[in-house]
Amino acid sequence: METVYDFFAKPINPRRFSGVKIALASSEQILQWSFGEITKPETINYRTFRPERDGLFCAKIFGPTKDFECNCGKYKRMKHRGVTCEKCGVEVIQSKVRRERMAHIKLASPVSHIWFLKSLPSKIGNVLDLTLKELERVLYFDSYIVIDPKNTDLSPMQLLSEEAYQEARAKYGSDFEAAIGAEAIKALLDKVDLEVLSTQLREDLKATSVEAKRKKLAKRLRIVDAFAKSGVSPSWMIIEVVPVLPPDLRPLVPLEGGRFATSDLNDLYRRVINRNNRLKRLMELKAPDIIIRNEKRMLQEAVDVLFDNGRHGRAVTGSNKRPLKSLTDTLKGKQGRFRQNLLGKRVDYSGRTVITIGPNLRLHQCGLPKQMALELFKPFIYYRLEQKGYVSTVKSAKKMVEREVPEVWDTLEEVVKEYPVMLNRAPTLHRLGIQAFEPVLIEGKAIQLHPLVCTAFNADFDGDQMAVHIPLSVEAQIEARVLMLATNNILSPANGSPIIVPTQDIVLGTYYMTKTIEGTKGEGVVFSGPEEVVAAFDSGTVGLHAAISVRINGKLYDTSVGRVLVWEVIPQQIVPVFKTIHFSAKKEANSVLAEIKRGASFVDMQKKHGDESGVDYERAMKKEDMITEFGLSEADADYLFSLKEGECSDIIGISDGYRLFKLAGYRSEIPFEMVNRPLGKKAIRELVDGAYRNTGLKSTVILADRLKDIGYKYSTLGGLSISIDAMVVPEKKWDIIKAAEKKVEEIANQYKEGLITQGEKYNKVVDIWSKATDDIANEMMEAMRTDAGTPTGRFNPVFMMADSGARGSKDQMRQLAGMRGLMAKPSGEIIETPIVANFREGLSVLQYFISTHGARKGLADTALKTANSGYLTRRLADVAQDCIITEDDCGAMMGVEVEALVEGGEIIERLVDRVIGRIALEDIRDPFTDEVIVRGGEEISERHLSVIENSGLTKIWIRSVLTCKSETGICAKCYGRDFAHGKLVEHGQAVGILAAQSIGEPGTQLTMRTFHIGGTASRKVERAEIRARVDGFVRLGDLKLVENAEKKLVVMNRRGGEFTIVNKAGREVEKCPVIYGATIVVKDGQDIQAGDVLAAWDPFTTPIVAEVAGTVKFGDIVKGKTMQEMVDPVTGKSSQTIIDESRTHDVRPRISIKDDENKTATLPDGKSKARYPLPVGAVLLVEENDTIRAGDVIAKLPRATTKTKDITGGLPRVAELFEVRKPKEAAILSEINGYISIAKATTKKGKQKVTVAPVDGGEPREYLIPRGKHINVYDGDYIRAGEEIVAGSANPQDVMNIRGDVALARYLVDEVQEVYRLQGVTINDKHIEVIVRQMMRRVKIKEIGDTEFIDDEQVDRQRFEDTNREVIANGGKPAVGEPLILGITKASLATESFISAASFQETTKVLTDASIAGKTDYLRGLKENVIMGRLIPAGTGFVEYRKAAEK
């Protein structure tokens, strides 16, 4: 029997096709698609609302407007399916065909397609070798073009004006062919032979060496090749038939009052039809040529406007003065088809409402309002009611639900039970912005959210809204439960630290209860165990804050009652600790066991033998963990757990060899030490982290929930509140301010005497006040801390809130009770005068005014930056969206070398933090004992960290995404650990999107930060000295030093250098980088203590130091030309500054130092002369003929004034790095190792020539340095490749060319990390590496060899290697390419998938280029698949794709 379903067309399975091809359509093809020609501009009859025949909505062409009903009403119902009505000609069929059927308009005269004309580079122009201007003159009927000159002396494709054409006709008659308009262009395109043209262009390319010409030829060749390969004929770019969109995609809706709402496209089509009909009529009437030409031009313009309004001439506007939306506009931009409808669909089974807090929920639950659940789960309820026999039809079920009888609510409870729902809070910046929960039905109209997931959602309860979505299919429910349930997402994917961490009130509660107060009831009592403490506390014998002693797990601890109460809620398990040795051969295992039985120490054997020798392999493990980790049988595990403490096991066979175990002892999974301290935010985070690492997921979730409960309980009992007395102003505040004012006055005097410049004064003053503010803040914290233990036993609540990390920050407290400090102007500069008052004392009018300045900036910043940050995230997601883990191991032999991130002598990130969770490339060995710490190919995990740190390793080779050899995607070994779960990454994980989210999410958070501090300037006090961090001896090494008049050593290395500190064993323990001009206050070999000052410098100027003694002589320093004497209006003192005013190019301001014989002195190295070129902006500190000593400063260069360092400076910097833009003041880097020589004379343009001559006598490199730039090197210096000749930010392309692509990648990773580090945000390196890998996927062709490539073409690295492999196999010459780095926007647009690129940016250009090349999109990325409506090839969709491929 047929079912109703059989009558309908079945939807095609979206996996049935393997790709999407796009190409330019010919007129024949458009006619094939069409269901009829539209000849009338009418739309619908306004009285009957029926479509007019042959009009834009014609039912005969497009199908009926009502299901199975013809236009005149003769045939109705489904029984006439497929009949065509003889009266009105309409087929009886579903009305939805009006969404699919196209029509066409036959044009009376061909027109050009504006995309192929105007989208740069112009496709028509490049095929014909005409400029856009020339083409437009022909197409818009301004000039004739010669098609075939035959025997005349006209040249082919020559443009003729109206007069010239008439003259030529008069002169030659019909001996030549010329035409005007699109017909002419079509005739020319028809004549083009692509094969011949392509060959000719390739020959021309080989023959020319002019760069501009080569570029132009390559561009033409690219377009001609695309046409040739795809089989698209260039003449199809001229349209003879315009396709018409199906009518339901450009609807016309009647409104009340007889008006209509219509899509703009209808107006645009109407204009085309009207003009086309008028042109037909004029041609039939044989109207004068000039009228017909005008009408043809108007038709061309009408079609242009239909395709892309505003591209040519002024945009056509509708009745309400806004431009009409053309076909291009419906695709483009955020509101276009791609982003609005294909990537951002709205979904059913969803709802949204306000959120409130649900403090009594468990972590996997959320409170769902009953009314909402009833609406969302309706179909399920109908089904369940029917099942239970309450109703028999859906209709009666509907009625029953509408009446809301009690049975309905019971049914709802059953349906909702254990059915996961997804909650989402916009903006969803990372994957934790959508999580699944089990709903608990509640009264009221707000969703209740568990407080611990607020961090992940970035939610608060000041009116935020959240959306609920219901996973419908069983698969979706499983995924929601297994992958998305809140309890399965405890760690942050960005850095692996827990993200489900108690905050705010909970922290306040735990902090309050774990603090001790002297003199509390029951102080000093000793208890035998935690149970006793709890009993005593319950009976009121001891107070919460009493300091007591307790025996826990056999050890006596000094602790407090509150801490024992916290310890009691922690899920505890006592587990055995095993030491173990792994052997691959049984023989070796037997001999070791025999030795141990003879009395040898197990630890010694562990270090000597086994595959992991050198690792003190000791683990506390549960039985099930032992079974899974070592591959033991149940029986073996039981045997091990029956051992006595200190006993050694027999040899146990496991999956990959043999093991010996020794039971070393027992311990609780979470040691009491973790709780035995005041539990602030940081301590609690460590506790949760430790719980996750040691006890696994389940216990951690229980712990988090219990901490939440106890935290809320005690923050309520503690009842902390703020009073004005709690804001203690430190007594020393005014002393510190007076001292600072005195220093500022000194600096003002120095400035008045002309010793320092305006810029230096500003910098120093800002520095003094920054330091004073910090000092006051520290004093204030101390004052409040001591206040916390006052005899009355009261805590200082403000201090507690900040110290525990529950609310507010040290910064905000400083403003309340310290001093507000320096404020920033909107430009980012810092105002010199600080606000010395705080909020408790109150601000004066002036102070208040200054502070509003900065606060407003904060607000404006926030608004602007959020958009910027969102855009950065979008570009990142786009470039990395097809990065998926596709295989286990790509077999790469390469990796990257990682060292600790050091800035200015400070370790910003330790080596172990950078390598954790990565795979070792080769064996990591202890540099002293040569023992293996980690085997090559093994993951560097937590247990290796202390060993690596103690071994003194400074560099480690690891596998990296940057060197992964996988053809598509990335392999698991090169990626390493998946931070969200703490184990090796799984196949199909979309690591690209993960990386984009991890980098983009903090960006948005950081922009919000200025908003909360309220405009006070945050600035690090500039470092001006190096202090030793450890005891040891100084080794100055190969620093170039000169002793100055004060007998101190001055560093003369122009590019800076470093000295080291070694410990007693001669091991290097610290590196101290110093800058040029720094004075070193210690001697070589001197014994130093931690905290000693080793070197100092002026942080605000770069000095120029004389290396020899003698007499000063000026060269080319002429007042008014190269030197300006400025009298300071404030001080009346004059200073001499080098300027660049002279119009002649051959002046080089310099200072020479003459010896006693009045010759230029020779430097200590005996080669170079003592000449010092002076850059623009240098301030002279000596006069001519002064006598100076070695080490004296002769001139100084002020550094830029400091602006506030915040993410505002940071986000644009991150964007600049990811877009690989050339920095404004780019550094000039040496490309080779060699010796410097600086030419005396300058070039014609006044540039200075610096030559680097290689040691081995190869080709020297020359660099032209612009006038007035400070050269970082001296004549005769040795310089390494990649070092700076002129300082500045490095241009990424230079770094790549000189030091290679891996070095560049490391450079980008470190630079991006620096920005985020400043803000205290941790992102793992691998996320940035994934993005950088995507930016480096292209190769620029340098030599084409025997391949099809074109010079300077950018091709995908994979395609490049494949093509070369083929060419070599056929005995040809491969192409040569150089690695290329593209910015993220360029890289996204250069992806192989045109669907992805078109939905990103420049839609028109991408589609135009793809359609002439006949590109196929094989749907490998995520975005293409979402747009095509398929499952994404990642995660659970990944395996399915693999299966499909294998079939």
UniProtKB/Swiss-Prot annotation:
Assigned EC number: 2.7.7.6
Presence of keyword Disulfide bond: no
Binding site for Zn(2+) 2: C890, C964, C971, C974
Entry's Gene Ontology molecular function annotations: DNA binding; DNA-directed RNA polymerase activity; magnesium ion binding; peptidyl-prolyl cis-trans isomerase activity; zinc ion binding
Co-factor binding comment: Binds 1 Mg(2+) ion per subunit. Binds 2 Zn(2+) ions per subunit.
Entry GO terms, CC: DNA-directed RNA polymerase complex
UniProt keyword terms in alphabetical order: DNA-directed RNA polymerase, Magnesium, Metal-binding, Nucleotidyltransferase, Transcription, Transferase, Zinc
Superkingdom of the organism of origin: Bacteria
Entries under InterPro entries matching the protein: DNA-dir_RpoC_beta_prime, DNA-dir_RpoC_beta_prime_bact, PPIase_dom_sf, RNA_pol_asu, RNA_pol_N, RNA_pol_Rpb1_1, RNA_pol_Rpb1_3, RNA_pol_Rpb1_3_sf
Reactions accelerated catalytically: RNA(n) + a ribonucleoside 5'-triphosphate = RNA(n+1) + diphosphate
Family note: Belongs to the RNA polymerase beta' chain family.
Subunit architecture: The RNAP catalytic core consists of 2 alpha, 1 beta, 1 beta' and 1 omega subunit. When a sigma factor is associated with the core the holoenzyme is formed, which can initiate transcription.
UniProt name for this protein: DNA-directed RNA polymerase subunit beta'
